[in-house]
Swiss-Prot record:
Family under the similarity heading: Belongs to the bacterial ribosomal protein bL35 family.
UniProt entry tagged with the keyword Ribonucleoprotein: yes
HAMAP family: Ribosomal_bL35 (MF_00514)
NCBIfam families listed in its UniProt record: rpmI_bact (TIGR00001)
Organism per entry: Zymomonas mobilis subsp. mobilis (strain ATCC 31821 / ZM4 / CP4)
Biological process, per Gene Ontology: translation
Protein name: Large ribosomal subunit protein bL35
Length: 67
């Protein structure tokens, strides 16, 4: 059986933690930030953990992991 390919969009957007969780960057911080307050910009600077329901789907798209 041939090797499974990883979805290229998953390679660009997600990282796996050592415990098996999936991290991603928070959306909404590329442009038009002048209309948002400092709290919004600060909170969107960090990475976030994907919910457990979507976790299974993303792991299926990256069968051999990403790290």
């Amino acid at each position: 059986m041939p090797k499974l390919k990883t979805k290229s969009g998953v390679k660009k957007r997600f990282k796996f933690t050592a415990n098996g969780k999936v991290k991603h960057g928070v959306a909404g911080k590329r442009h038009r930030l002048i209309s948002h307050n400092a709290k919004y910009i600060r909170q969107h600077r960090r990475t976030d953990v994907v919910s457990s329901t979507e976790n299974r789907t993303i792991k299926a798209w990256a069968p051999y992991g990403l790290n």
